């Protein structure tokens, strides 16, 4: 039902190769997140827990040009993989990734 997306497929492969846990949302859940961003006309998004950036990419793609997504990731390895994936997907300019415990990152 959801067409294959070569970039998102590669992101999932990158996550697997990097040894990240397989906790990514399913494609239909990612599409639903994207729909929520579009319907609410969100300009700012806060995501707590980035993992490899898969859901981040789904949401960031739907942001307007002046939109911004802030995502928080406690694990340094996960954050590095996510940074690479965000760049691969071309959304790194709309996403700010803060590494460290979420409560400290929000201060």
Q: Model regions: which residues?
A:
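Rossmann-like AdoMet
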Residues: 1-25
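S-adenosylmethionine/decaboxylated-SAM
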Residues: 20-107
């Amino acid at each position: 039902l959801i067409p294959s997306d070569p970039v998102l497929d590669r992101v999932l492969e990158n996550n697997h190769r990097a040894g990240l846990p397989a906790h990514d949302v399913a494609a239909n859940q990612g599409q639903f997140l994207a729909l929520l961003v579009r319907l609410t006309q969100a300009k700012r998004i806060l995501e707590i827990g980035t993992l490899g950036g898969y859901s981040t990419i789904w949401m960031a793609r739907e942001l307007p040009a002046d939109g911004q997504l802030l995502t928080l990731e406690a694990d340094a390895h996960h954050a590095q993989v996510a940074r690479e994936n965000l760049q691969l997907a071309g959304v790194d300019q709309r996403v700010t990734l803060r590494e460290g415990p979420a409560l400290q990152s929000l201060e």
